[in-house]
């Protein structure tokens, strides 16, 4: 209800799991749900995973990359605590198989601790549902740019010769219905300029876009389009965690420009 009569709202969720800076006068939102690095103080002493290994699996810097976008939501908690892009029954990494064969916990969290993690997970989706309802009530359709980043070396190790800078996953959406905005988004991504790097774009190459965020929102209403967009970690040394600020800046400016143009095109065509 607190969103219904407002155009601009920003803050942090009461449980602290995510931040938001929303412009509800436009039908498009950019998210970086895996940007977070924080782990609750009650969980940190139980963990076996090193901070370096945890950082490698997080989408480091994606909150900075979306910072110039007009309307955005970003995660603050580490996906080693709970993963917003998995269904709730798989969101807590209790075994190495659930976290790229990395053992997250030395000692298992209590049931109460796990409940608190899942409460933060649920709070994110309740908030997202409220945002979606406001946008659908106002515009009749809305679009979410679901921004992630991925480790290049892992794809190379799998035999991928040239992992793309941008990968759009469309296996979780009605590809035929959204043909025009999908094609336009791929085109906009290809126009983003990055220092000393050829911008390459692919669809369903390294990822198919079947994460929980896309699948859940897509099931809520047929007039919601989610575009799961992976950026390769060209903007950092994925082994040391050192970020290259010039590339972050180029991605931030390029993505904001692309989203404004594409979002306005979506608004004129579908709302």
Task: Tell where the protein language model's regions lie, with residue ranges.
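N-terminal catalytic or cofactor-binding beta/alpha core of small enzyme domains
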Residues: 1-271
């Amino acid at each position: 209800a607190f969103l219904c009569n407002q155009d601009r709202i920003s803050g942090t969720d009461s449980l602290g799991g995510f931040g938001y800076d929303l412009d509800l006068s436009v039908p498009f939102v950019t998210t970086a749900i895996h940007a977070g690095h924080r782990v609750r103080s009650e969980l940190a002493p139980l963990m076996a995973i090193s901070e370096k290994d945890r950082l490698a699996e997080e989408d480091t810097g994606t909150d900075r990359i979306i910072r110039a976008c007009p309307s955005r939501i970003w995660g603050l908690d580490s996906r080693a605590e709970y993963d917003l892009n998995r269904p709730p029954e798989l969101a807590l990494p209790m075994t190495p198989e659930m976290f790229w064969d990395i053992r997250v916990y030395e000692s298992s969290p209590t049931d109460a601790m796990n409940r608190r993690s899942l409460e933060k997970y649920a709070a994110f989706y309740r908030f997202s549902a409220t945002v979606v309802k406001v946008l659908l009530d106002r515009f009749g359709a809305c679009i979410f740019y679901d921004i992630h980043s991925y480790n290049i070396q892992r794809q190379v190790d799998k035999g991928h010769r040239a992992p793309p800078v941008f990968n759009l996953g469309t296996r979780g959406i009605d590809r035929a219905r959204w043909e025009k905005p999908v094609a336009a988004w791929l085109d906009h991504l290809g126009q983003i300029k990055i220092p000393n790097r050829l911008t390459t774009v692919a669809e369903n190459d390294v990822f198919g876009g079947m994460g929980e965020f896309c699948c859940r929102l897509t099931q809520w209403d047929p007039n919601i389009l989610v575009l799961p967009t992976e950026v390769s970690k060209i903007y950092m040394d994925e082994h040391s965690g050192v970020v290259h600020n010039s590339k972050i800046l180029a991605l931030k400016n390029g993505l904001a420009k692309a989203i404004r143009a594409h979002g306005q095109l979506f608004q004129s065509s579908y709302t």
